[in-house]
Amino acid sequence: MLESGVEEHDVEIDEGSIAKVKAASREFLLLQKAECFLLRKVMKTRDAFDIYGLRQSGVVLNEQLENHLEDTLMADQIDAAEIAAKIAQVDEKRCSELRALLPSEVFESLAKGQFGILREALCDLYRRWL
């Protein structure tokens, strides 16, 4: 794990006892989701939804993490056409898998827009390479 991808948090374990807990940062989680979305043999729309959620909460990749993602794209020879093709796969049929994972009102809201908001979040995330 990249050192910049680790955050340390104080967690109270009982009265007067504090433990230091290390966890992946939200930025690092976004990097992992960005890689998973493109590298999985079978695309999972839950990755697209997670990317959307992280982006909606203001998470962006810093320069170091963007460069790491670029290294991954180059190593796996993923070009703009492949990225665009993966994004296009985020359609109503594939997004039906989200019905079992999301509250019905969230799913229905996404479905009304034909899941376009997920594709927009992906286009924004990968804009540097599209």
Language model region names:
Residues 1-130:
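Structured mid-to-C-terminal alpha-helical surface segments
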